[in-house]
């Protein structure tokens, strides 16, 4: 693998380094530079933990031990070595001094270093070559198999006579617009954009060569028996799992709070769904499915009551559970596996939002695939994970994890037929490489350090929001964070702090089982004044859409907007600067709101797009929208529409077949009640399907759609989106329904 000049860092404690030793270091640095390495001048390290996190681009570290080092210096040395090894177990570490010997140095330090350099023994030339060799070995070991093969291929300079047609990027250089594209994305990305004709890279579709090696290495990292990279997101991973396991007429257990890809899989396979119903608070946050819903006896009762299941004795083929929910509710996966083992053939945990759980003890037992826990006896276990969501994969990077049961093994031939069905024969190799690298980043102590840092930053943000709120004068307002009533204690999070219990009220859920769920602290719901979790509106309020539009205009884009909340993710890429900038913008919004500054000043771009708001004060705009929400009782309406399961008139696959064969008609909202929908009807927010194809529209749902239409008419720019809701030529909102 080719690489640019190696970088060697020199560091020392806070005690001064003598003149002669400084001169020896300078000679060694000069020799390293002669060999092509970048030698960074000695850094005096006061905070070893912070320094350790700056070394990701370094190939080797030399720690300088001053003359006549005593116990105090050895204490600094111990702390330095511990800090390095806490984040990187492999980085070569050498000690440099005048008369260093193993007899003098602490044993815990000697265990962690590659060598000791005495300044006046070997020549600087020899020592430089030794360091260069160790640094090179380290860098050569860094790249996992597929990424190494891809970079080698891109660097070889081979002419491309295969697709893609841009031929390593040269086609772009034949056009002015194409040149802009080339300049933006760069040579490496375009040279590595190849097709499956390049045999030395292996085959994603057949899981051979370097691809297979990297998948096997990632499986070891994530504790799985098998792991497969997927390049079209976890939507595709879910469909692969389903098409490998589910057939027409199979009984399937599905979290009603599932991603739409699961509902698409139901339509594709012709399965008969039985839904497990989650709780929900009046602020619009989706809660957990009660423990009772997983009871095999309760599942059997639902099978008995289902009108489309003829043979009531059949075993459900698959369970799919959203783990975690969008808002961060995580289930006790170990308990669910024990409860349903043998009662369902396949246990599938959609962990699109939980790929990090394996790497920190806070989540022990809360993720599906775990080689440190007992296997299931009979039920095969899958987890589908979006490595692009919370880890470092590029968009669409996903993976499928499989854990065999004691008496049930994955049939790789059947699985790969489903994999082929849903995977492009022209996958994007940069996405494969990002799957490879994001898994490698989580390997060893580095993965734990990354997740611990994300948790720590999220906790610091939560503490900061709570502290600022506590410091506001009585009667003044500030933002909140949805979470335990007691502010997070200093230090790392404890599981018990984040477990949901029936005695707590902060979550707002009616039915909570002790020891069954927790809130993931890195998923932060920032709340605005105006609505409680019990659905009570305040006299005034700040709707979430106003705040999110303000923040977006000022460079802060959030993950999701609720009625009176914003959802933000503390991924492994979040920094102190980023979340402190968010807090600064929240302060600025508060100042503008309190002064009732005109919208055209507070949000000029939004005012240009929607001039009807330009001369309104920011507080006045919030008051008007809040009054409308309150008048329509929108919080309780948007909760109630999800509480009762609609009547099932057709199986989803049959309703979809009516759509594809043209046996549908587009029905206006006022005429919808009692009709059978042919499409998924999904309001955003929250993005949870309200109706599945084949279900009858209720009066309450019609009322909700009318209210949404009225709000959109009254407040253009602040309307939500309902997927599945169409618009006729005359502007009437319609839904595609099955002809009866």
Give the residues covered by each predicted segment.
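Conserved PLP-enzyme active-site core in the AAT-like
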Residues: 45-48, 53-56, 78-82, 106, ...
């Amino acid at each position: 693998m080719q690489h640019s000049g190696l970088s060697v860092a020199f560091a020392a404690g806070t005690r001064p380094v003598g003149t002669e030793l400084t001169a020896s270091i300078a000679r060694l640095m000069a020799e390293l530079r002669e060999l092509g390495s970048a030698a960074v001048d000695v850094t005096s390290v006061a905070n070893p933990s912070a320094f350790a996190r700056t070394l990701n681009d370094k190939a080797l570290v030399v720690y300088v031990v001053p003359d006549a080092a005593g116990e105090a210096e050895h204490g600094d040395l111990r702390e330095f070595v511990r800090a390095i090894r806490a984040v990187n177990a492999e980085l070569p570490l050498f000690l440099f001094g005048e008369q260093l010997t193993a007899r003098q140095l602490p044993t815990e330090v000697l265990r962690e270093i590659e060598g000791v350099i005495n300044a006046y023994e070997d020549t600087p030339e020899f020592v430089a070559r030794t360091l260069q060799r160790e640094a090179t070995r380290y860098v050569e070991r860094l790249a996992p198999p597929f990424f190494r093969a891809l970079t080698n291929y891109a660097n070889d300079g081979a002419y491309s006579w295969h697709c893609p047609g841009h031929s390593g990027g040269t086609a772009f250089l034949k056009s002015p617009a194409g040149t802009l594209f080339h300049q933006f994305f760069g040579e490496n990305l375009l040279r590595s954009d190849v097709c499956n004709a390049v045999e030395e890279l292996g085959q994603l579709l057949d899981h051979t060569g370097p691809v297979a090696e990297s998948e096997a290495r990632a499986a070891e990292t994530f504790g799985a028996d098998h792991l497969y990279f997927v390049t079209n997101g976890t939507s595709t991973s879910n469909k692969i799992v389903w098409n490998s396991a589910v057939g027409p007429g199979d009984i399937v257990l599905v979290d009603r709070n599932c991603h739409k890809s699961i509902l698409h899989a139901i339509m594709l396979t012709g399965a008969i769904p039985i839904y497990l119903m989650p709780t929900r608070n009046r602020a619009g946050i989706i809660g957990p499915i009660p423990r009772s819903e997983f009871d095999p006896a309760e599942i059997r009762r639902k099978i008995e009551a289902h009108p489309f299941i003829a043979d009531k004795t059949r075993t459900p083929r698959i369970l799919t559970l959203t783990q975690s929910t969008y808002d961060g509710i995580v289930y006790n996966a170990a308990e669910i596996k024990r409860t349903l083992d043998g009662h369902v053939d396949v246990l599938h945990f959609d962990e699109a939002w939980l790929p990090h759980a394996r790497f920190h003890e806070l989540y022990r037992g809360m993720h599906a695939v775990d080689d440190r826990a007992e296997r299931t006896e009979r039920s095969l276990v899958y987890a589908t994970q979006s490595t692009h969501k919370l880890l470092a994969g590029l968009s669409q990077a996903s993976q499928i994890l499989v854990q065999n049961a004691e008496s049930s093994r994955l049939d790789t031939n059947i699985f790969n037929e489903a994999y082929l069905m849903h995977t492009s024969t022209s996958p994007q190799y940069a996405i494969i490489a990002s799957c490879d690298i994001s898994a490698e980043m989580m390997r060893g102590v580095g993965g734990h350090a990354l997740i611990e840092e994300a948790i720590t930053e999220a906790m610091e943000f939560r503490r900061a929001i709570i502290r600022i709120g506590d410091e506001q004068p009585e009667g003044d307002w500030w933002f909140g964070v949805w979470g335990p009533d007691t502010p997070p204690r200093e230090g790392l999070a404890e599981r018990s702090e984040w477990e949901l219990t029936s005695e707590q009220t902060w979550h707002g859920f009616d039915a909570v089982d002790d020891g069954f769920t927790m809130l993931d602290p890195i998923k932060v719901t920032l709340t605005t004044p105006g609505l409680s979790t019990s659905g009570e509106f305040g006299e005034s309020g700040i709707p979430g859409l106003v705040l999110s539009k303000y923040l977006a205009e000022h460079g802060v884009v959030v993950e999701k907007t609720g009625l009176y909340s914003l959802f933000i993710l503390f991924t492994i890429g979040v920094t102190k600067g980023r979340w402190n900038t968010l807090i600064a913008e929240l302060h600025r919004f508060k100042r503008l709101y309190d002064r009732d500054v005109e919208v055209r000043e507070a949000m000029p771009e939004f005012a240009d797009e929607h001039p009807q708001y330009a001369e309104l004060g920011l507080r006045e705009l919030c008051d008007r929208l809040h009054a409308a929400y309150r008048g329509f009782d929108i919080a309780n309406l948007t909760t109630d529409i999800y509480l009762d399961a609609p009547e099932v008139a057709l199986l989803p696959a049959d309703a979809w077949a009516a759509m594809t064969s043209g046996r549908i008609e587009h029905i206006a909202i006022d005429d919808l009640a009692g009709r059978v929908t042919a499409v998924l009807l999904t309001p955003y927010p929250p993005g949870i399907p309200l109706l599945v194809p084949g279900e009858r529209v209720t009066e309450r749902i019609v009322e909700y759609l009318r209210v949404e239409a009225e709000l959109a008419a009254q407040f253009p720019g602040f309307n939500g989106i309902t997927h599945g809701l169409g618009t006729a030529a005359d502007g009437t909102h319609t839904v595609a329904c099955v002809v009866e």
